[in-house]
Amino acid sequence: CKDYAQMSEKAARIFAAQLILKPNSVLGLATGSTPEGMYAALVEKYNEGKIDFADVTSFNLDEYYQLPAENDQSYDYFMKKHLFNHVNIENYNLPNGMVEDVEAECKAYEERIEAAGGIDIQVLGIGKNGHIGFNEPDSVFIKNTHLVELTPSTIEANSRFFASEEEVPKKAVSMGIGTILKSKKIVLLASGEGKAEAIAKTVYGDIDPMVPATALQLHNDVIVILDEAAASQLKPEDYLSLIHISEPT
């Protein structure tokens, strides 16, 4: 794609097609600046009467630990601001980072996803260090939803949303790599030069838990949607084949 706007519109079309083909779809959603444009485009399509969220169930990738939902930096707040408050979705789920028994919450979250029939389509952004969800570089891939310690680079990247770095939560509850890979279809979005290296490692690198997104190579239905800057470290022929794959039919 040429730019962020084009990337967002393309991603929104893929999600809209999913909802039209299967109105009771189970969506896997992400937060952060990358999918914001996609959500805005979906709200627009909803307002035009093209899509309906009445029978949709959604599960978010992650939520900060010990940050109340009403805090304007919580992912619950983000989702309401950018999507949930603007469409007719009733059955949405986020991990609860305020519970005392985190392990039980993680297990319950996995069970809720399974009970809903699994995720039909999952949107992902990617961190500069290759993280997806809050699955940070590690010596092993963590399979299921879990409590994660955020790395200094992630805390620094997220500090732009907080008054100071000290205020950024140091932990989060996140779907595991195994949870993400169980999704039937995955849409990976990346925009900007800052993501180019992570994308190149994801596409060309060995599968390595130090670059969590490389696990996506194990999935048989991943659509990668990039703007030109994020694709700048890919070989032209690979970028063109990715563009071809991600063209909405």
Spans of model-derived segments:
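Glycine-rich anion-binding loop/nest that anchors nucleotide
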Residues: V123-G125, V168-K201
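Short internal beta-strands
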Residues: T57-L61, A190, I223-E228
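N-terminal active-site beta-alpha-beta segment that forms phosphate/nucleotide-binding
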Residues: C1-A108, R112-A115
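Internal active-site segments that recognize and position negatively charged phosphoryl groups
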Residues: K107-V140
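Accessory alpha-helical/coil subdomains and C-terminal extensions
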Residues: H146, Y204-L242
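Residue-level detector of conserved catalytic or cofactor/ligand-binding positions
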Residues: S241-T249
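Class I SAM-dependent methyltransferase SAM-binding "motif I" and its flanking Rossmann-like core
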Residues: N129, G133-I177
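Glycine-rich beta-strand-to-loop/alpha-helix junction loops that act as flexible
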Residues: L29-T34, L124-K128, S191
